[in-house]
Design a protein with these regions (language model features):
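Short, mixed-charge, low-aromatic patches
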Residues: 14-24, 71-79, 104-108
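Membrane-proximal low-complexity regions enriched in glycine and acidic/polar residues
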Residues: 24, 28-82
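Internal alpha-helical transmembrane segments
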Residues: 1-38, 132-153
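Exposed beta-strand-loop-beta-strand "reactive/processing" segments of non-cytosolic proteins
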Residues: 74-98
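Extended, hydrophilic extramembrane loops/domains of integral membrane proteins
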Residues: 90-143
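Mixed-charge, polar/low-complexity N-terminal
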Residues: 5-6, 11-12, 85-88, 126
Length: 153
């Protein structure tokens, strides 16, 4: 490939990904400066007798049923287990935390602020499609850096 094609490819990739990189730099910089965002938590009443078996083979279906029984219409891509609780993912938008307690199940609705949502995307906790975009962006950034270095020499 001749030099002009490399320059055009480099500039196109750089121009396309600059807005994304600016958002990543801003969200990461604000996080490091202590602006981590916030999450508004609301406890949701759970039906009497609701239970949650964290070792269930049908955990996704169990959680979907528990949410539906509580009157919550929510689609999630996967669950993250931690201790005696489960978190629906992605956490870059409204999500739910279900905790197994001695009294049954505690469900809490979590609504992240814009900054918290940006941090969650930055950490890779966004939707699966966005994660694929991030992988592509990482390759494009590597291309921009290497081609820029090579073209500058």
């Amino acid at each position: 490939m001749n030099r002009s094609v490399w320059i055009k490819a480099h500039l196109f990739a750089a121009a396309f990904f600059t807005p994304v990189l600016v958002v990543i730099a801003i969200s990461g910089g604000l996080y490091l400066l202590g602006f981590k965002g916030s999450v508004e938590e609301t406890t949701i009443p759970t039906p009497a007798g609701a239970s949650l078996n964290l070792d269930s083979d049908t955990l996704d279906a169990d959680v979907a049923r528990l949410l539906a029984d509580a009157g919550i219409s929510h689609e999630f891509e996967y669950l993250r287990a931690g201790g005696n609780s489960l978190t629906t993912r992605p956490t870059s938008t409204t999500y739910y935390v279900l905790a197994a307690t001695a009294d049954g199940v505690k469900i809490s609705k979590q609504v992240p602020s814009l900054q918290k949502s940006m941090i969650e995307l930055h950490k890779g906790h966004g939707p699966v499609l966005f994660k694929e975009f991030q992988k592509f962006m990482a390759l494009a950034l590597l291309f921009v850096l290497l081609s820029g270095t090579w073209l500058g020499l």
